[in-house]
Amino acid sequence: MGVIFFCAIFLRVYRLAQIPDILQLDEAGLSYNAWCLVHYGTDRYLNIHPFYAQNFEGGQSPLYTYLLVLLIKTLGQGNISLWLTRLPAVLASILLFLTGVKTISCIFHDRKFHIAAACFLAFCPYYIMSGRLALDCNLMLCCSAVSLLLLLKYIQTDKLRFLILCGISFGFTMYSYALSYFIVPIFLVLVTLYMLYTHKITFPKAVLFAIIVCVTATPVILLHVHCYSNGNPFIFWVSLFLRLLPSVCLI
């Protein structure tokens, strides 16, 4: 297992700034926005400390942007490089590897499954490339995997600390990519109803879980209240219901 883990790291860090040998458009926008935030406190469109730094024809998720800001201030000492820009993707990919293997080990006790999962996560081209490109969407996969592992640990152990950590993790997932605004709430509603039905969670714990997720994701919620309703919460919730209704009907 150690050899597989070493190979996984090597495939993600070897010549990181040269392979791929192109600067992807979103990477360029992300790195320049982060650099501007470090030095001027604005994105490149002069928005002061934005929740969403503006990129070409839209915004970029805050988690990757502000992780990169932190790295530029610390490791980069104010300077930006392609290697530094891609470092959060590498760290997320390695964490995904560890989380995925741990999740499989919690479900299957046969070591062959653990090795198979490790090989798949280490050598699958998609997982390799997701760790070598600075795309904000790639962080959602890692955050979701961590959240699911913590949810699984709670179901298996019924320990409150795992439920709290799971709620925090799902809340942070909302900062990773815009698609999570639809997927995470629908998933959490369905899985909570299922756990209530199967007595895996009590109603007070379910309420606590929902509160933790909402508190952690409060900036995201406030942003969308402002964007979709001009500050009117009633209009926001009605518009959100209408947006989610087709997805719920399909489920």
What does each of the following model-derived ranges do?
Residues 8-11, 117-122, 170, 174:
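Short helix- or helix-capping micro-motifs
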Residues 105-111, 145-163, 173, 198:
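Membrane-interface transmembrane helices that cradle and orient dolichyl/undecaprenyl
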Residues 83-109, 146, 150:
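Transmembrane-helix motifs of polytopic, lipid-linked glycan transferases
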Residues 1-14, 95, 105, 115, ...:
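Start-transfer (signal-anchor) and selected internal transmembrane alpha helices
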Residues 4, 100-123:
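Transmembrane-helix signature of polytopic, membrane-embedded enzymes
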Residues 13-16, 28-58, 63-66, 70-74:
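Extracytosolic helix-loop segments that constitute the early lumenal/periplasmic catalytic or substrate-binding loops
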Residues 85, 89, 126-137, 179:
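Short acidic/glycine- and proline-prone juxtamembrane loop motifs at membrane-interface regions
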Residues 30-40, 172-175, 181-251:
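Transmembrane-lumen/periplasm boundary regions of multi-pass, lipid-linked membrane glycan transferases
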